[in-house]
């Protein structure tokens, strides 16, 4: 019972971390990375489809991504989708290859993105703390129903607190790493 609560909490906290990682990957730093464009939806025969499912995305150099559509007629819709994504990118097409040069980030944009990173990290921390609270409430219920002793409850709460502290430390590490990436010129 106690192990089930702890394991459930751990898996839910790890999902929160995974979600944060995904959100941070979407934010543009000064360097080219395929995850920057993977979430963009492209009109593929009237169906909104992720770019990664209609083309291959590669890093050409540190400031340029190249996109090779799997179908020739997808070049136009991919270009439009990138422009509509509001990432401040201007794709250039050369035959079947779409090159996306990444302009250097302005200081103002860097600060804005750093603020977004801090907000996303705070959302992840809150989610992890909510999971801890729910687990502790479940443990209190078990104790009220006399299924576990007070000592077992305290030990389990300590284990959940250690887990929470470790996950929040990981969130802080990911956020500070992303902020450092953003502020590097």
Swiss-Prot record:
Molecular function GO labels: ribosomal large subunit binding
GO biological process: cytoplasmic translational termination
InterPro entries: Ribosome_recyc_fac, Ribosome_recyc_fac_dom, RRF_sf
Disulfide links within the chain: none
Compartments where located: Cytoplasm
Record's keyword terms, sorted: Cytoplasm, Protein biosynthesis
GO cellular component term of the entry, any: cytosol
Domain of life: Bacteria
Keyword Protein biosynthesis attributed: yes
HAMAP family given in the database record: RRF
Function: Responsible for the release of ribosomes from messenger RNA at the termination of protein biosynthesis. May increase the efficiency of translation by recycling ribosomes from one round of translation to another.
Family classification: Belongs to the RRF family.
Protein name stated in the entry: Ribosome-recycling factor
Organism of this sequence: Coxiella burnetii (strain Dugway 5J108-111)
């Amino acid at each position: 019972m106690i192990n089930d609560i702890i394991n459930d909490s751990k898996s839910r906290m790890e999902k929160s971390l995974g979600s944060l990682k995904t959100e941070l990957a979407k934010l543009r730093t000064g360097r080219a990375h395929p995850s920057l464009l993977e979430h963009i939806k492209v009109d593929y025969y009237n169906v909104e489809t992720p770019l990664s499912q209609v083309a291959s995305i590669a890093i050409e150099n540190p400031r340029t991504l190249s996109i090779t559509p799997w179908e020739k007629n997808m070049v136009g819709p991919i270009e439009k989708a990138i422009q509509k994504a509001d990432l401040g990118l201007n794709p250039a097409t050369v035959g079947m290859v779409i090159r996306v040069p990444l302009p250097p980030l302005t200081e103002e944009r860097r600060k804005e993105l750093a603020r977004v990173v801090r907000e996303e990290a705070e959302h992840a921390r809150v989610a992890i703390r909510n999971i801890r609270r729910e687990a502790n409430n479940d443990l209190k219920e078990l104790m009220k129903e006399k299924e576990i002793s007070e000592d077992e409850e305290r030990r389990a709460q300590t284990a959940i607190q250690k887990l929470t502290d470790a996950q929040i430390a990981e969130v802080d590490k990911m956020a500070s790493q992303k902020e450092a990436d953003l502020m590097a010129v």
